[in-house]
Amino acid sequence: MKVKPGDIFECEGSFYQTIRATAKTATIRPIEGTFEGCADPYGWERKYLPVPGRFTSDPWMGRERSERGQRLKLHDSTCNGNRPELHMGYRTLALWDGAPSICDTYN
């Protein structure tokens, strides 16, 4: 699967939009997410949806890389190559599937 500009990646309630892409890399910037409600009866897990084009800053990336974008190498561990991922430090960013992203606030 080819990644193209405008594609959205997610990780635990955080969203990132692709601004440039090649066959092996993607340059991403963080975008805002909107709170959609609780995902469990106790209120620990929260659902978020992305707001495409509303760029913001991300503490994981830092201010400078948030503004100009961060280039990351694409990975795909599936046999048919249809689930691209980006690795940013220890975080794995998966291509957003359209479902709300779940952020677990229970620590």
Residue ranges, per PLM feature:
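Conserved "cap/hinge" positions at secondary-structure junctions
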Residues: 11-13, 30
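Short coil-to-beta transition motif at edge beta-strands of beta-rich domains
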Residues: 1-11
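Short beta-strand-centered aromatic/proline hotspots
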Residues: 14-23
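Basic/aromatic-rich interaction segments and small domains that mediate binding to polyanionic partners
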Residues: 23-38
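Intrinsically disordered, low-complexity, charged/polar segments
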Residues: 36-107
